Amino acid sequence: MSKKVLITGVAGLLGSRLADWIIQNKPEYKVVGIDDLSGGFEENINPKVDFWQMDLVNHPIENCFEVNKFDYVFHFAAYAAEGLSPFIRGYNYDNNLKATARIVNECIKTNVKRLVFTSTLAVYGHGDGGVFNEAQVPKPIDPYGVAKYACEMDIQIANEQHGLDYCIVRPHNVYGIKQNIWDKYRNVLGIWMYQHLNEESITIFGDGEQTRAFSYIDDSLEPLWNAATKPDASKEIINLGGIEKHSIIEAALILKEVTGACCVAYEEGRHEVKHSIPTFQKSIDILGFEHKTNLKEGLTEMWKWAQKQPMRERFVWPEYELEKGIYSFWKN
């Protein structure tokens, strides 16, 4: 019987690129992917993936589990828009918490060896002076972080009650080829590339002194695989990457150097964490993470790819659940 892995969110950045990596480096595994194509694109999916177009909340995902009997499950599917989440609360909790609960149920029923769940550094909130350590008690400041933290707790309870093995990974500002650059609510580097491709000024919210740590997608792929397969990763929570720190202004200057973008427009500040710097030693020690690609190198590769992409319409949220307090730059 062939070995099988499931990747949810297989049309997105993490999912599509991990599928490529497994197919190339672990040919003994069959890759099955689920995605509803709400935030990713079918052309991102490797043709060797057995693709199921499904909504994790409303469609019968149990059929996929029953047919395949997965060894490992990588649950990446999520709409990761921290700033937008206060205005789409219902969708945020359905898309993250309810979907994850269904995945957890099926992993338990079918005896999956390990569930790898991608959480977020948004669970930390402001952290300890802007530094995020896995030992800290999470204090999220937005509904997206709340939802992801609830998912983490549910997965840990599933381990305690049902023996479901897991590794919770908290990636940080992962970027690269196959990222959705057409979504105006998330992924600052992709937003800037879209703006430059469409001859718009690149936008910075607030003073631009916010600090972020960026990770190129290629550096994260083998560590994600190790999260599923390494014995030491069992029942661990691990920040992934985030070794290279930049202010938003510094990141914009690097992007301008790579792309030739010239104009910067400053917008009103948002409700967000000022400094977001993870500790990363556990990802090195347990997952074998290596920081191989600096921001300029990664943006150069991403920019080569972005210039070849179709001129899709920009994604605009059709109707907010809550209009009160929404930022002027997001008003429809």
Segments the model singles out, each with a brief description of its role:
Residues 140-147, 171, 181, 185, ...:
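The catalytic Tyr-centered alpha-helix of NAD(P)H-dependent dehydrogenases
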